[in-house]
């Protein structure tokens, strides 16, 4: 399986103030898209995306375990020392999966809050593992797709796309019989 990542930049910050005067920060917008050829030349068939998002919602979102990181790491695992937000919802609207995430009070969450306060435009990039099949001029994500996170917070679409292409060409992730993912050179 290869590391697959996608970038979306239509994310809006939301700041709410609770009764105790504390501000809560959220990001909301399109996290992922199905049945559309994206900028990386990939298509996520809706039936594959829907099955995986349903699993992700049950196993991660509903259990408050759907973390995302600030930046885009090289592997499929979540690094708790880099977590910046917790995805609270991920729902299908047409071909779009709209997400909402609460910015946490972690060191990286505080960086995100400062960026929002200073007017930065942030994007999200999904991260998962799966196989790709070339069909015509697009690569189709196959049924073994596994979502690692519906969204890491990133700044610039060009850098994450170039970075992920490099990973996809050089590293494959193999699930061992012990359930541990291992990186191997492709």
Feature annotation, model-predicted:
Residues 42-43, 73-82:
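Acidic Ser/Thr/Pro-rich low-complexity disordered segments
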Residues 32, 69-73:
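Acidic/polar N-terminal loop/beta-strand segments that form early-domain functional surfaces
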Residues 3-4, 13-17, 21, 26, ...:
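Residue microenvironments linked to proteolytic maturation
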Residues 1-63:
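Polar/acidic, low-complexity leader/linker segments enriched in S/T/G and N/D
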Residues 36, 75, 105-107:
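Short, charged/polar surface micro-motifs in flexible loops or helix N-caps
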């Amino acid at each position: 399986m290869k590391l697959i990542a996608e970038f979306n930049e239509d994310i809006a910050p939301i700041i709410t103030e609770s009764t105790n005067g504390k501000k809560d920060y959220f990001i909301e917008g399109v996290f992922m898209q199905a049945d559309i050829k994206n900028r990386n030349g990939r298509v996520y068939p809706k039936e594959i995306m829907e099955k995986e998002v349903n699993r992700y919602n049950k196993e991660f979102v509903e259990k408050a375990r759907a973390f995302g990181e600030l930046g885009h790491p090289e592997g499929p695992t979540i690094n708790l020392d880099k977590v910046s937000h917790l995805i609270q919802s991920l729902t299908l609207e047409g071909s779009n999966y709209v997400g909402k995430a609460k910015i946490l009070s972690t060191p990286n969450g505080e960086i995100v809050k400062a960026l929002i306060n200073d007017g930065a435009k942030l994007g999200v990039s999904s991260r998962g593992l799966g196989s790709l099949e070339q069909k015509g001029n697009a690569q189709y994500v196959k049924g073994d797709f596994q979502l690692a996170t519906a969204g890491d917070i990133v700044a610039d679409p060009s850098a994450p796309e170039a970075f992920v292409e490099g990973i996809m060409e050089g590293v494959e992730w193999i699930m061992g019989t012990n359930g541990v993912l291992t990186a191997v050179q492709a």
